[in-house]
Amino acid sequence: MLIYYSLLPEFYTMIYVSPDNVAERFMRYVQVDTQSDPTSTAHPSSEKQKDLSKILHRELLGMGITDATTDEYGYVYATITGNSDKKNIPAICFCAHVDTAPDCSGTNVKPIHHRYYDGAIIVLPDDTSQVLSISASPYLKEHLNHGIITASGLTLLGADDKSGVAAVMEAALYFMQNPSVKHGDIKILFTPDEEVGQGTAKVDMQKLGAQFGYTLDGGEAGSLEDETFSAGAATITISGIIVHPGYAKNKLVNALKIAGAVLDALPKNEWSPETTSDREGFVHPVAVNGIAEKATIQFIVRDFAVAGLQQHHDRLKKIAAEVVAGFSGATMEYTIKEQYRNMKEVLDQHPQVVAYAEAAIQRAGLTVKKESIRGGTDGSRFSYIGMPCPNIFTGMQNIHSKLEWIGTKDMAKAAETIVHLSMIWEEKS
């Protein structure tokens, strides 16, 4: 149903997506195991991700989207052809990822739809130690008398990011069933391997053919994320001196002990993930490998500003060099790898991308919550390979855990926001 609603000074169409419909779709998708594998070098990292890609491909074709395809890497591409008389409307992409995180099992997910959440503590049936409560998850208050979905206690739920997948699919169905709603070309993209940092590794941007995009991979209803960390990796390689341990006095220099000394020299009460928040950056050791002769320490380095990122590298290198200098004969190599950059640097050059998203969220009846991500998204990478791409909410909560949950009305509002956003691009072109 289309209802014309006036909010001066403009008229726009109110959109309604059924929370029950999007919930049914979401619950089907989460039962497909699509966990990605951080140890794999294949694309996709796990073949089972393609199981959901194939389902989405079939369902898109079933909606009448005839160009829907799935490629060898598990990416799903589709186009809802524009129906406006305007010729200058940019093609807009809506993207979500099919994989779930390696942090928690995604096998045999059993979703439970709590249709009218009453505020009571929820004990998950398959592991009664898993308890969901308003005191631990205050956002539950926003869903009193509405539906929420949990897993059964043994697995994650998969709302990250099958809620985004469900919202995009429900919006696609809306467009196909309501041809009077005007829009330009809408590009749909479902990616594998976002959770292991490879979501854009094999995407064909020419095939996608979108000028601007939006990932559906966010939290509370109304949230809009247009800023991420800038990210790098650092590897410190320490070379010692190895001799027979029986004759090693005053000769052997153990690289493993030096690596331990470097880690011990790092600040204890600052500069780490466990001691920082908001807009603070950090340095985080993630792996130590080696033998007495040679050892490596791998770090991730994060800051919202590229200049801040470099300052972290300079400080880390100085600390390590001072430690290594205390071991006669030892040497050190410090290498940097760029991972991704703050998407805000690109989005600020295209302010309409975020402005239109804010307007769409408001048209969906929500308050915009502008947020920064203390991490990265596929949108970070898309923004730097030609498709400026902020991140829009879906409602996911307690992600990557057995207590993951989502509100059905949030997913419905995400789908409505997609429709409004597509209409705004048509109106403003």
List PLM regions with ranges.
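Acidic/His- and Gly-rich active-site-bordering loop/insert found
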Residues: Y16-I148
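Phosphate/diphosphate-binding glycine-rich loops and adjacent basic-rich segments that engage nucleotide
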Residues: T215-I241, P245-A248, L252-I258
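Short, Lys/Arg-enriched N-terminal segments with co-localized hydrophobic residues
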Residues: M1-T13
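Metal-dependent amide/peptide-bond hydrolase catalytic core
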Residues: L256-S429
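Glycine/charged-rich beta-loop-alpha catalytic/anionic-binding loops adjacent to active sites
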Residues: L140-T155, S239-V243, A364, M396-H400
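Short beta-strand segments
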Residues: C93-H97, L189-T191, Y214-D217, T237-S239, ...
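Acidic/histidine-rich catalytic neighborhood of metal-dependent amide-processing enzymes
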Residues: L140-F229, W271-V286, G290, I297-F304, ...
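Short, conserved micro-motifs enriched in small and acidic residues
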Residues: E47, T155-A166, K249-K257, W405-A412
